[in-house]
């Protein structure tokens, strides 16, 4: 099941500012990440997945994990 970064963030009941703070980036940088997830590095993607509690593969590759 593929979900977007926004869906994962909202599912975690977090604001863009909260996620940006945890990733150590400016909120505008995080907003660009949500709009262009193909530009997110693997490291950022894995950190994001840990923060919001969703599997990296589900968010960035649309692969359902077991």
Question: Model segments located where?
Answer:
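Short basic helix-loop element that most often maps to the first helix and adjoining turn
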Residues: 3-22
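Short, charged recognition helix plus adjacent turn
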Residues: 8-13, 39, 50, 58-66
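Short coil turns linking two alpha-helices in DNA-binding domains
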Residues: 15, 26-29, 55
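Acidic-residue sensor for enzyme active/binding pockets
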Residues: 16, 34, 57
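Recognition helix of helix-turn-helix/homeodomain-like DNA-binding domains
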Residues: 25-39
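Alpha-helical DNA-recognition elements
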Residues: 32, 36, 47, 65
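Long, hydrophobic alpha-helical segments
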Residues: 42-45
């Amino acid at each position: 099941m593929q979900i977007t970064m926004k869906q994962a963030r909202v599912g975690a009941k977090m604001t863009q500012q909260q996620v940006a703070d945890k990733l150590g980036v400016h909120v505008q940088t995080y907003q660009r990440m949500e709009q262009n997830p193909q530009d997110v590095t693997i490291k950022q993607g894995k950190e994001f997945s840990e923060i919001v509690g969703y599997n990296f593969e589900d968010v960035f590759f649309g692969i359902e994990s077991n």
